Amino acid sequence: MVPSEYRLPDPVQRDLEAEALLALGRLDGALRAARPATLRLFALRLLRDLLVAVLRQEGHAFTDHRFHAWFAGVATLSDLPPRLGRPPRVLCEAVLTELTHSSWEVLAELAARFQAALLAPGDHIGNDLAAQTAHQDAHSIVIAARDLISELEPTPLPLPALERLHCAVGEHVLFAPPERAPEPIAMGSIRLTVERAGTPSPHWALEMLWGEHWHSAGLMAHALPFPGLIRLDALRTDTPSHPWEPDEAPTIVATALRDVAQGLWCNLTEADQLARRLEDSQPGRRRSSRAPALLELLAG
């Protein structure tokens, strides 16, 4: 059996888990100590990054600059023809609608503002039935994610909670990694069978809602989305080129938690630095001035 790049000896695994828990604890502590202006800037970036992550997870290919132009309604999201991913505007609308109900008021308020600012072109212009079907599909994904998470018992232990989440994802008909389906094709007299990729797993909905689960368990000060937290490679099965070893999964899960928590903490630190620079650039402003809010929105 080929050794796995993820398989670690027990002492190294323990160190990795300690790093993951330390990163999550440091993030939570920083959130609790953060000033309101810092939290607003952090949430602005988090919401934007979440929308980008959702679209890319669904298979849409674009640059950050193109995303901003598309969001503002001045360009299409990509010059490439649409693939298997779900319609981009419908996805953004589903995310923003759900987050307007977030228990974190800062995020809920920003989601409502993003809803009003979303000027991206419609996905099914002139086809009301297709548009309605796409909205129902996106809504059903969010409902399924909420139901799956609600069935998991809250626990103050982050890593066991994540392992249970991954197990539930692997057993779920909607969120499990898609299987490649064989499809026969004909090229003249030649007949071939090719494998087509299935529709991407919409685990973005679980990452969007997971912060509410940890918040209700007392693990996080605020219900953050955690884009990138679910790793489908922790749910792999045996393949001829890579025999699957169950011991890999805890390492992959701990690595994901560490990396995501560290990334969010870095974003929060940058938001605090930016908030201080904005404050220093506005000496003597009136308390009723709208300039701070405008600068925060532009900076975010």
For each feature predicted by the language model, list its residue ranges.
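FIC/Doc superfamily catalytic core
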Residues: 1-300
